[in-house]
Amino acid sequence: MSGNRPIKFRILELFLDGKEYWNYEIVSKIQEEYNMNSAYGRDSINFDIIELASGGMLKDVEQKVDEAGIYKKDFLLHKYVITDFGKARGSDACLRYV
């Protein structure tokens, strides 16, 4: 559970299992935990994921167009995995020792 942990820390924590996740899977989990159920909340969380990827903590491993409207119809979906750098930063933030 998230508690009062900053959202980006929680996102990293979800990825620490080493599995690949689509952005919409992480977004929906964070929306539920932080009660951010608006379109603004959804897009804000997605932007946090993009920032973590641009900072080298997550790696974009697959993309596809959201034809079914799972996240936002006709938008690009991304699948991410945590990097070694992300694991180290997560450990530094005391999320979990890896």
Segments (PLM) and residue ranges:
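Residue-level marker of regulatory loop/turn positions in helix-turn-helix DNA-binding domains and
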Residues: G3-N4, F75
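Short capping segments at the starts of secondary-structure elements
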Residues: L16-E25
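Phospho-regulated, low-complexity intrinsically disordered regions of nuclear gene-regulatory
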Residues: S44, G55, V61-V98
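Short, leucine-enriched amphipathic alpha-helices that occur as contiguous helical runs
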Residues: N4-L12
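Short, positively charged loop/turn segments that connect secondary-structure elements
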Residues: Q31-F47
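Alpha-helical residues within the helix-turn-helix
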Residues: S28, S54
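Alpha-helix C-caps/helix-loop-beta hinges
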Residues: G18, G55-G56
